[in-house]
Every structure is written in C-alpha cells, then in structure tokens.
Amino acid sequence: MTSPFLRTLLDEASRPFRSGGHFAYHYARGKLSSDSIFREMLKRGLLPASGRYLDLGCGQGSLFAWLLAARKLYEAGNWPQDWPAAPQLLQLRGVELMQRDVDRAARAFGKDHPVVRIEQGDMNQVDFGQPDVITILDALHYFDYAHQKSVLKRIHAALPPGGLFLTRIGDASAGLPYHLCNWVDHAVTFVRGHRLPRLYCRPLAEWVELLRSLGFSVEHDPMNEGKPFANVMLVCRKA
C-alpha cells in the first residue's frame, strides 16, 4: 500500500480505532495496509453499487471502517479515476464470536452509529437476515466441515439472486505456503487475545466444488501480493 491515495484511505479507515486503544488502532492499520483483499474488492468493483452487508467473524469491524472511509473519500471527490465508484452502504452488520473484539468495535463506531451494528454471536446460530453481500474473511475454517457446509447453505438461502458472498480461504493443497498461512493465523489470533483449536481447511478445488454444488458461481484469485502464503479470494454469486 504505497500510493498517496491508499495512504489517505488507510489513515481515514484506521482513525475510528484510535478511541479503541493502542492495540485496536495498530491492528487495524496493519491488517488494512498489508492485506490486498481490501484494496482489490474496491479496485475491481466486486461490490454492488449500494447494499446491505453482513460480515461474519467480523472482528473489531476493520472491513466496515475501510468501506466507510472509501465512500467518504469518493463523495469528497478524492478517488482514483480508473476505479469504480465506492459502494453506498445502506447497512453494515457484523457478527463476532469474541466479546473483546465486539467491545473494541463499540469503542470505535459508538453505540448509535447510523449504519454500523456489530453484535456478539456465533455464525453457526445467528439469523443472517436478508443482506445483499455476505463476507467471511479468514474465519470459515475455524469450525468443522459439517458446520461449514451448513453455514454456506444458509448464506446461499439468505442472499437475493445475484447476491455476493465474498470469502478468503487457505488452499490446503498449496504445501509449505499453506502451512505458513496457518502459523500466521494462529499467531495473529494469539496476539488478539484468543486461542485457535484445529483449523478445518480444504484444497481450493474442494472449496470451489462445494460452493458450486450449493448454487454459487465461483471465481477465485490468489490474494498474497508477493507473500509466501496460500490465500485465495473466492468471489461467489448466487445464480
């Protein structure tokens, strides 16, 4: 993340987390600056022009801060000419299992934010409502295969025709880069004050086959940006 615009976007997106304390602020900056999926979802125009979002396993809400900052800069006329318009955000709902992260989100966004609502809950149990976009970034492999399939079926049922499910997975067939991903995942989760049990990962081909069998069209693209990892973005749309 080197261009002046991206630095401005990063500053704007991480600003709300100053009120959440040193860790929340620097965690948001580190994640948003080093993780190419945030930039690419905007640059490639993957998101609808306007819509309601549900982020499952949302953590402290870094994705929402990023999208809000993007829309603010777009409306101010500070936006790359070759990028699609930043999406209009009708509703941003996040579900996070860990109360510590929910508390950090509350300090960042406040209790009466007009768009953002982040709640403590388990994605295996909560009602998904009727969003236009559902995201799971790096949390789908935290629970077993049967629950993964159940969550994906419920995501498909919750989305409207053409609705977007955007996720990122670690490709279990990638060898050493996959194992490096897992090590980093455990390390980051530990720093956030949590512990991870076994991770339930799959080869990329198996993820794609499962999602297509549930009624999604699937496109996939590596999201590593020069790092020796095995992260893959899956862009899934309900037929």
Language-model features: where?
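Conserved beta-strand/loop positions that form the S-adenosyl-L-methionine
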Residues: 56
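A short glycine-rich, Lys/Arg-flanked "PGG" loop and its adjoining helix->strand segment in the class I
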Residues: 149-161
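Helix-capping/helix-break motifs at membrane-protein junctions
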Residues: 144-145
